């Protein structure tokens, strides 16, 4: 049988555009720059002018909540609600939307609605959450552009809790949907779902050391394996996994116990039959399934015949009511290890009193014993967890408050500061994990003040290099993933940032002392309420230095500056939480703390992606930072210029010069010498980060733009714009 011809080319073909062997297939180690160009406006159907924050402010949130509460008990025949209430399902959906967050790199979380898309929509741990989203569709359809899927999923979780008698801590909207899968998130290297730690490409090494920044124990799980580590039903060992994974999501022991006990107060697990009855996940499902996955052939495939995790049963009686039942049952009974109908390890309570029996979710004539997972039992058998859980059991109000706060943190952790929260239910209380900064209550400096302060700063004797590196160090902690870090707050003067190696503490202290004196002198000279913050001065110093460097090159450039930053206090700074923002590598400063399994250029691209930079922005910043002499420790690597601290395009001109031949000088091939091709004279030294801009074809193409004789003006303007983007990255109040 011959192939039919392509209607476009007229040729026989088995492929269309985008098919065939890819560049990545040919060159699997090729630097992935695609992560810098995700979420293009070309993939977003809402259009460039769409302003979600503005749309959300016009939403009748109370009306949406009323509809969501009504939905909870409107059981649908195609997916019947357990006990006639979808609350447990909606809580799981919201939890799993938020629970992918990990504090190591700030990626994951509920902030983008990514559960709708691959791979999360098809993770084994998210089995049947596609049904939850389909149940929500009528509400989404009704309110349309005024509420994103990202916000709706979290709001549905809140409404589920409230409809079952729980008082939540609050809700902040403002999560904007993405429209294509995220390619920047490292979920692990395993090649099979739920691969155990003894399989190839394991995320574990040594004595069960979990690879950073991962916060889940197996590929396709949100946190832990509920059956125990690698399916081993050991509650104490499971407790170690629970503690590690929750800590990586920024939860302490008290928050962890509150979340587990509070969340498992509702709903049930589903394991009515074996997994061989379950069809493919949404991304692999046939066309006619219309995006629904895990279609089950076991009996009715729904209701009491549902197969999800493989564990079967509820944790306590009254699974649609907020009460202390979970903790009461956990400590009241002894537990026996059994296998669920699906073959999963779980525990059933022994000798259960009638009042603690659980009415079947779909047959009120049946009663079942409460069950616990191995992970649940860690709250009883891990000594630290047990102490907390028993305290909560004895103090219901404390437990309710702890769960409310932990749930709010879980569902809002990746949203950044409170200024990004929208809606009438935003809590008034300021929380330490929100990285608070004081409100600007003083009169801001004007353009005349800015000009005068630039002159004053440049007259202090601080070098261009010192001013640039300090401003960069302050601003470049920003992460677009969870909207943390940045220059606002001037936390570079506080622990832990002031002591980070990458920030060169000795030099930093000198610069900050000098800028603080400028601040004090300026503020003391004001008769009114006008003030300048140190946070603003740090950034302004960098801007002034860049402009001076342009003048040193015989050019002029205006670097934008917008005042309004304030200075946070040490009391407003959670030191342990900020430790994860420490750059272990910063290619923009040619810094790497130690050797890593991934290359220096990959670490650079990762840092650039967190800073929300494009490949051209990353390229022009590298070229500018090198000639500004902004390397860590004033190293000469990559400083391809005879006029350091002059903002020229020399980095690109000399990198692209064919008169230079490069050779590795280290066994790891991370340091290089560039010698004159004819004489052999040493001209330059470089790191992998420097040379990637001449080696990688895409980056070289960009570098060539800035290496042309007519590019100096474009280079200056593009550098100033990219610099301003980094300096302003955390100024959410200006949006």
Curated annotation (Swiss-Prot):
There is a cross-link at residues 223-249 (Tryptophyl-tyrosyl-methioninium (Tyr-Met) (with W-95)). GO terms for molecular function: catalase activity; heme binding; metal ion binding. Residues 1-25 are annotated as: Disordered. GO terms for biological process: cellular response to hydrogen peroxide; hydrogen peroxide catabolic process. There is a cross-link at residues 95-223 (Tryptophyl-tyrosyl-methioninium (Trp-Tyr) (with M-249)). The record marks 92 as: Transition state stabilizer. The keyword Oxidoreductase applies. GO terms for cellular component: cytosol. It is an enzyme of class 1 (oxidoreductase). CDD domains: catalase_peroxidase_1, catalase_peroxidase_2. Formation of the three residue Trp-Tyr-Met cross-link is important for the catalase, but not the peroxidase activity of the enzyme. InterPro entries: Catalase_peroxidase, Haem_peroxidase, Haem_peroxidase_sf, Peroxidases_AS, Peroxidases_heam-ligand_BS. It catalyses: H2O2 + AH2 = A + 2 H2O; 2 H2O2 = O2 + 2 H2O. Heme b binds at residue 264. Binds 1 heme b (iron(II)-protoporphyrin IX) group per dimer. This is Catalase-peroxidase.
